[in-house]
Amino acid sequence: MKIALIDGEHYPDVVKWALDKLGNVCCAVFLGGSEKIGSLEEVERRLGVPIYRHDDYLTALARALAENPGVKEVVDLSDEPIVGYEDRFRIASLCLLHGVTYRGADFVFKPRPLNRTSKPSIGVIGTGKRVGKTAVSGFVARTLKAITRPVIVTMGRGGPEEPELIDGEKLEITPEFLLRIAESGRHAASDHFEDALTSRVTTIGCRRCGGGMAGFPFFDAVDRGISLAESLPHDLIILEGSGATFPPYRADAYVVVVGARQELSSIANYFGPFRLSLADLVVVTMADLVKEEKIEKIVGVVEGVIPRAEVHVTVFRPRPLGDVSGKRIGLVMTSEEALESSARHLEALGAEVLHSSGNLSRRKALLRDLEGFSGIEGIAVELKAAAVDVVTRWALERGIEVIYLDNEPVNIDGKNLREAVLRLGKKVLGRRADDTRR
């Protein structure tokens, strides 16, 4: 079955002609306009199908989709000036959320079928790259260890061809171990290594290539990773996205990570609303790097798209995975803007930060920076990008201690993210337990 999107800028006879050509149209949604029609009752009689209408056309479309569960496709028979680019992205977001294809005269947005895991699951996805998604995913895993035994399934652009299990609960992940991984030709700073290192949980690394506008991967090996996760004695699967792309599984709940430095348009428009609409919990990160007005706008956008979601505004604080007290260190991160506050935080822990670089994702510039790192006995570095094959190798060759850094999300809005994650975890575990009993 199909739903047709119509407007008052077309004569009813023309719309009827188009509906007949489409065939199998169960209803129509009126988007606006009145130039070429009389009353909607007249139009409805002429077309011979029910017409849904609301001041907010998305509300009308959502109702039409809810009341006609057999619909497979929404067909757009409207045009400028009734709908523009932004309107059509909003419509596409709603259609994809319902698993329905959205088709127009020269475009098609088709959802990828999303399977469900046999075990309870929480998705951690981002609205873009470099928003701190892996840090939040690690935080979620560490937090949930208090009530369950989680396993993280990642998918990265540098992930392994076959799913790779890292037993972070038992394996000692040292700089030397990671360097051996890198020297074997594998990506030792891949997300599943980072999660295992920072959260001491079991992780499974998968790969993906390409990402669509809405966030579906072009190719991925996640199915085999999920099968492996479901064979383990763990109770809950955390599905971790990659950049703005997410695993092709429908999780029981979602944590959506929004970076405060992102362009507001990428959150509010295009397929930002689609990602947000999945959220049960929204974590706004790096709030200390923008003005308060920007944060207010981001929160406003989130609440406008998904009012039921709980929103947390956070900053990242470096959490060294080794002792930095009394040591002269260098600091290496991916973000130039975060260097100053991170250095202050490490100095509050007793370190003396002599040098710093925000070029972790720019290898040539990073090597130039490292040449000037004199007089240090340790180097603190995020496990990202060139952390292993460049920074770790450079440090170990010189007998310098490597201290990996985690980025811990800390609320600045008076809320408690840890408690929110625990509530979400209990809700997901409880819901699946109820389903099993039924």
Curated annotation (Swiss-Prot):
The protein's name in its UniProt record: Cyclic 2,3-diphosphoglycerate synthetase
Keyword Transcription: no
Primary localization class, coarse: cytoplasm
Function description: Catalyzes the formation of cyclic 2,3-diphosphoglycerate (cDPG) by formation of an intramolecular phosphoanhydride bond at the expense of ATP.
Matches recorded under HAMAP family: Cyc_PG_syn (MF_01908)
InterPro entries: Cyc_diphosphoglycerate_synth
Lineage: Archaea, Methanobacteriati, Methanobacteriota, Thermococci, Thermococcales
Keywords, sorted A to Z: ATP-binding, Cytoplasm, Ligase, Nucleotide-binding
